[in-house]
Amino acid sequence: MDVEGAFADEEELAPHGGWASADFDPAEFGYEDSDDDFDAEDFDETEFSNPDFGEDYSDEDWEEIETAFGFDPSHLEEALCTVAIVGRPNVGKSTLVNRFIGRREAVVEDFPGVTRDRISYISDWGGHRFWVQDTGGWDPNVKGIHASIAQQAEVAMSTADVIVFVVDTKVGITETDSVMAAKLLRSEVPVILVANKFDSDSQWADMAEFYSLGLGDPYPVSAQHGRGGADVLDKVLELFPEEPRSKSIVEGPRRVALVGKPNVGKSSLLNKFAGETRSVVDNVAGTTVDPVDSLIQLDQKLWKFVDTAGLRKKVKTASGHEYYASLRTHGAIDAAELCVLLIDSSEPITEQDQRVLAMITDAGKALVIAFNKWDLMDEDRRIDLDRELDLQLAHVPWAKRINISAKTGRALQRLEPAMLEALDNWDRRISTGQLNTWLREAIAANPPPMRGGRLPRVLFATQASTQPPVIVLFTTGFLEAGYRRYLERKFRERFGFEGTPVRIAVRVRERRGKGGNKQ
């Protein structure tokens, strides 16, 4: 998202969007349609069908083949520079982060210590993409949770390509500011000094003392009112190195949507995680109407949960607040990276459950299915549920299933590992060499069926994207849906990918006539 407008006014910023394309669009993945048959004339079809094809190929060789077929995988390997926003507690770091990324993601409250983790967000300024890293308030004389926060800030300082050191114009220099400035002066990383809360030109006189920190000219900024940040971003881009120091940053916190039909226990689960009554909970279906974002620290990570109202009726037949709650549930799924689908295990699986599941898979989101109210199960119901799973959830065998009780806390500790595994696979990429080794073996075991009197050849495979994983097969003819399902099954047998949909897309390479024209 381009954030240049973030410093122009106080309008509502756009929320985080989600990828929900169900159809394969070559333009989305860097393919170029051309009249030269993908510029792949150097490759003979018989070469691709050779069982030994590609065995001794290097990564560079596979990249040449991908390029010949019109595919540029560089967007999957994009390495971005990082700017870390550091400073003592309550100087306005998270507000500045929100300005830098052009949307309200970082948590902003008017008391110290709100940001407890080192969290990264993607920003786009002047056509350049980079990471903006929000940190907790740094203080050298703290213990407990605040010591952990300070440690996260130090890690950010050690891995960032540029550091923005934020001080408070209204408060002036504190002892913590001086200690931190001395630490930054010893660092080899470029530092930009930002004097935040510069809300009036009458404060120019207050800027003078910040020169004593030894970090150069302070940039007067009002993050709250969107003033001065553009100059800081221009300077950040100027100071970025050609290659980033760290290439292993993941945007976070990861976004989770709790979804399911009304009264299935979404709010109860959220409250159990949060340890507080975050949402109004009642046995009346549809108690929670609006999604409520909650940042919650579980055992391993900080997560952003969205608690939704649930779908009582189909959107077309719902009325009033139910209609808008349904629309918001769609929005929550689109905005999430991972969906936890809650199903009431004590009742038969319903059409509503199936409908919400279809929304998730159509949107291409990572998925964990939580069978709630397990404390109400008896032996007869368990037998019935096993039968329902075989009939109604057979199309998502890849989804992790956890039996829980949000009321008693049963097995809730198993949810986070399942969520992490699903997201790891949602983000995962298989090398082109591994893909084509698997493809040769799968085709040798079961060749594609004849179509129109001709046997289609599968020439080559590459992974076009992640989130969700999309595998593109270049072929000489169309592949039947049943054969694509076979390939997906063999793909999962080899590589796993539990917890995420995997899309198998086919791109037919049309044959040329002897004169070089397509037939």
UniProtKB/Swiss-Prot annotation:
Gene Ontology molecular functions: GTP binding; ribosome binding
The chain positions of domain EngA-type G read 81-244, 254-427
Compositional bias (Acidic residues) spans? 1-12, 30-54
Q: What does the entry list as the binding residues for GTP 2?
A: 260-267, 307-311, 372-375
Pfam families referenced in this protein's UniProt entry, alphabetically: KH_dom-like, MMR_HSR1
CDD domains attached to this UniProt entry: EngA1, EngA2
Q: Which residue ranges are recorded for the region named Disordered? A: 1-54
Q: Which UniProt keywords apply?
A: GTP-binding, Nucleotide-binding, Repeat, Ribosome biogenesis
Question: Which amino acids does the record list as binding GTP 1?
Answer: 87-94, 134-138, 196-199
| Domain KH-like, chain residue ranges per copy | 428-510
Query: What GO terms in the biological process aspect are recorded for it?
Result: ribosome biogenesis
PANTHER family linked: GTPASE DER
What role does it play? GTPase that plays an essential role in the late steps of ribosome biogenesis.
Family (UniProt)? Belongs to the TRAFAC class TrmE-Era-EngA-EngB-Septin-like GTPase superfamily. EngA (Der) GTPase family.
Q: How does it assemble?
A: Associates with the 50S ribosomal subunit.
**What is the designated name of this protein?**
GTPase Der
Q: By which gene is this protein encoded?
A: der
